[in-house]
Design a protein with these regions (language model features):
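Conserved structural position at the C-terminal beta-strand
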Residues: 10-12
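Amphipathic, non-membrane alpha-helical rod segments
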Residues: 6-8
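Short, exposed coil/turn segments at beta-strand boundaries within extracellular/luminal domains
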Residues: 14-23
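Conserved small/polar residues in nucleotide/adenosyl-binding loops
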Residues: 1-4
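Flexible "stalk/tail and boundary" regions
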Residues: 27-204
């Protein structure tokens, strides 16, 4: 696809199984870029199930990968060019990333043999890393007062100081396999397992 005008054939099928066909003229303008091969600085990766996330200014896209290792690629959204890649040494299926208002990227990985929560500066350098009691297969959540909540696959909910990675508290929950964590407007924390959904006040 490049800047141009295209004619697209369209067929609509209605609930009564009748159809109607026609064509649409589509104009593509301000074309930026189409696709990019995740290969930069000698590091490659396949995109995992986690979705990409964006910097606060919308200019950088962060893409977590899974194999051959779980690198995090930073791409300029205007040009499609790589800015940097943060290397993680092993396969990291699952997990997820989020971006704080100050631009720090928090990356959780589904691997229990290495550090599995990373804080990465906007320039791609490591801020801190910690190893929790199990792999993390879902997205973390960040509170307005700077607490990062992660739920591991052993169903342990961790509250981490987002600035240092220090563990503020942890709570074992019933059930196996933790889900993503959510925080409401009042700061209450919600975490689900295969057994139940739990709610905690910000100070536990």
């Amino acid at each position: 696809i490049r800047d141009s005008t295209y004619t697209v054939a369209v067929t609509v099928t209605y609930v009564n199984n009748t159809t109607e066909s026609g064509s649409l003229t589509v104009t593509v303008g301000n074309y930026k870029w189409n696709s990019v091969d995740l290969n930069f600085g000698g590091l490659t990766g396949y995109v995992k199930t986690s979705n990409p996330v964006f910097s606060p200014d919308g200019k950088t896209m962060y893409i977590p990968t899974s194999t051959p290792a779980g690198h995090l690629f930073a791409i300029d959204v205007v040009s499609g060019e790589f800015k940097w890649v943060f290397a993680i040494s092993q396969i990291t299926y699952g997990g997820g990333a989020l971006v704080a208002p100050d631009g720090t990227i928090y990356q959780c990985v589904r691997n229990a043999t290495i550090n599995n929560v990373y804080a990465i500066n906007p320039n791609g350098t490591q801020k801190w890393a910690v190893k929790l009691d199990a792999a993390i297969g879902a997205f973390p959540a960040l509170s307005a007062d700077g607490v990062l909540y992660c739920l591991t696959n052993k169903s342990t909910l961790y509250a981490l100081d987002a600035s240092s990675g220090a563990i503020k508290w942890q709570q074992s929950l019933d059930g196996a396999t933790g889900s993503a964590v959510a925080i409401d407007k009042a700061g209450n924390v919600y975490a689900g397992t295969s057994a139940a959904i739990y709610s905690f006040k910000p100070n536990k």
